[in-house]
Amino acid sequence: GLLGYADPDGIVFYHLPAKRHTLATEFRVDAATVLPRVEIIYVGTTSQPGVARAAVQAGAKGLVIAGTGAGSLGNLDQELAAIAAEGIPVARSARVGEGRIVRDDNWQQPGMVAADNLSPQKSALLLALAMQASSNIEAIQRMFDSY
């Protein structure tokens, strides 16, 4: 429903967002900020191992997986687990229009974060901001849970 109203006398909120956003953020970015490179890898039933490794070899410091359904890693599961084990954050998101990516031991390996309901594009931006703020994967997951 409506969060509130924007009228000539000001903005009135009746419902506040549950997640942090915009000015209520821990991230500090200015014109001189260079964010870490994050690549989005689209995964489907015909995805072949090697594409995620190629992105890392080309300079990606983090990866966002645009998976099917609930963020499935498809044929890239072992490759992505190895990349995450090397300390390169991997965020699981979905390329479908709705739904959440939840933490689940069947799909998620150590070093991976669940992107909740964020699109792959929003996940890539948040992962870059999170990586600038921390290299700790638990802290990065907390940021994905918060925004």
Question: Locations of the language-model features?
Answer:
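ATP/nucleoside-binding phosphotransfer catalytic cores, i.e., glycine-rich phosphate-binding loops
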Residues: 71-147
